[in-house]
Amino acid sequence: MRINVVPTGKVGEVEFGMSREEVRTLLGKATEFYKFEDDSNTTDDFGFCHVFYDQDNKCEAIEIFSEAEVFCNGTLIFPTDFITAQKAISDLEEDDEGLISYSQSIGIYAPDGEMESILFGKTGYYNE
């Protein structure tokens, strides 16, 4: 599966700010769950991705797993390696769990140096 992303805008056809119902119409049946103990809202699991919602049930972030290939500006950025991702997204910086871009709301989860997932969020997602 190929997914084209516009950072802070949309992931595939899903746009940040869409309602949970609109996302489910596009992506299909979801399993609802709490990803973390302190979450105030549920996350939708669509198999290849998790979709996170704010208090108003508006899409605020999407985490994609290795079942999909993610492209940004025509360049494969996931799954790939740190160097390739950093060339495509110039302000990615290393953190404890992988790579993060605060300005583009992108987080790459790679706790052991290998990419396991990539998260795209709405503007300011990592600053909240």
Predicted regions and their residues:
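Non-cytosolic coordination micro-motifs
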Residues: M1-N41, F46, D56-E128
